[in-house]
């Protein structure tokens, strides 16, 4: 996982699986309230969803409220399965991303990712991930079900995506896929930008 990869390269002391209740600024330092203890740091990077970061900050300033508060999220059920009935009938047009719309006027698109193509893996069986389509999947073909939250984008979020530099200061910096198009790569780019905007030299 990402965490395991990062942990393997860090030399400092790391705390995992720790419940953080509040983060706030105090006399030029950043205080994290964690497991009923107060820990002092020079800088805090919020590598999480925008709404989660906003909930963690005890007294967010106006810019943080307005910018982070503009990002909204939706919950989606993702199912890892092997039911090819959710893929196009013509296998020659299978793609990394596929969708089916049963009724153009009323139905939402059923999105299915072909993990074999997306991750360049060649298992014996097709590995598929479908969003919000569990009722269409053969229960016997389901391998695992998960609930994820994804950012919802509109004109307001697009405008606020250009303001990351305005809130990566005064001890706090914010990174996450919401600064881009919601992909893993966007999260990495936003982290590099957060470091640059905060003026920290890693």
Task: Give the role of each language-model region.
Residues 1-7, 15:
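Short beta-strand to alpha-helix junction loop
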Residues 5-8, 55, 59, 193, ...:
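Residue-level signal for well-ordered alpha-helical scaffold segments within enzymatic catalytic domains
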Residues 6, 64-67, 117, 158, ...:
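Residue-level detector of functional hotspots within protein domains
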Residues 6, 35-37, 164-168:
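A short acidic-Thr-Gly-centered motif at the start of a beta-strand
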Residues 8-13, 168-171:
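A short helix-to-beta-strand connector/capping loop
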Residues 10, 14, 42, 198-202:
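Short, hydrophobic alpha-helical segments
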Residues 12, 18-152:
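Mid-domain catalytic core of redox enzymes
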Residues 136-202:
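C-terminal catalytic lobe of FAD-dependent flavoproteins
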